[in-house]
């Protein structure tokens, strides 16, 4: 039997695997990836023996740091990061929720200073707990739960 790859291999870069279906676009925003400047291979809602369905994001030519990759845990807590060199996986690790999240989440409190258009203040959230995953706004102390994070990601 001949097996064909649906998504081509990359020579050097980062592969984010085991992403919940439909999360690849949000992850691109979290990582501040500009698809007009980066070669990307995005597979959305593909079959997975582990998850049933999943997304895969291949970022060619860019090795994500562990700190960058850990931001992915906000929407994909079981994601796997594969660092690829010379078409082979050189490193592999699971993401972990970051201690601090800056700039790309919006505070749900409409009265928070970060939501005042006259004040150019970026959001800063500090992790309060891992299970359940919760973050607290540094400015207004509002808590953000894991189930709220996806809807609070700022559009690019």
UniProtKB/Swiss-Prot annotation:
Keyword Protease carried by entry: no
Pfam families: PyrI (PF01948), PyrI_C (PF02748)
Entry keywords, A to Z: Metal-binding, Pyrimidine biosynthesis, Zinc
Single GO cellular component term: aspartate carbamoyltransferase complex
Keyword Glycoprotein: no
Gene Ontology process terms (BP): 'de novo' pyrimidine nucleobase biosynthetic process; pyrimidine nucleotide biosynthetic process
Note on how the cofactor is bound: Binds 1 zinc ion per subunit.
Top-level taxon of origin: Archaea
Cross-referenced Gene3D superfamilies: Aspartate carbamoyltransferase regulatory subunit, C-terminal domain, Aspartate carbamoyltransferase regulatory subunit, N-terminal domain
Cofactor: Zn(2+)
One Gene Ontology molecular-function label: metal ion binding
Residues that coordinate or bind Zn(2+): 107, 112, 137, 140
HAMAP family tied to this protein: Asp_carb_tr_reg
Homology family: Belongs to the PyrI family.
Role this protein plays: Involved in allosteric regulation of aspartate carbamoyltransferase.
Assembly mode: Contains catalytic and regulatory chains.
Name of the protein: Aspartate carbamoyltransferase regulatory chain
Species assigned in the record: Methanopyrus kandleri (strain AV19 / DSM 6324 / JCM 9639 / NBRC 100938)
Encoding gene per record: pyrI
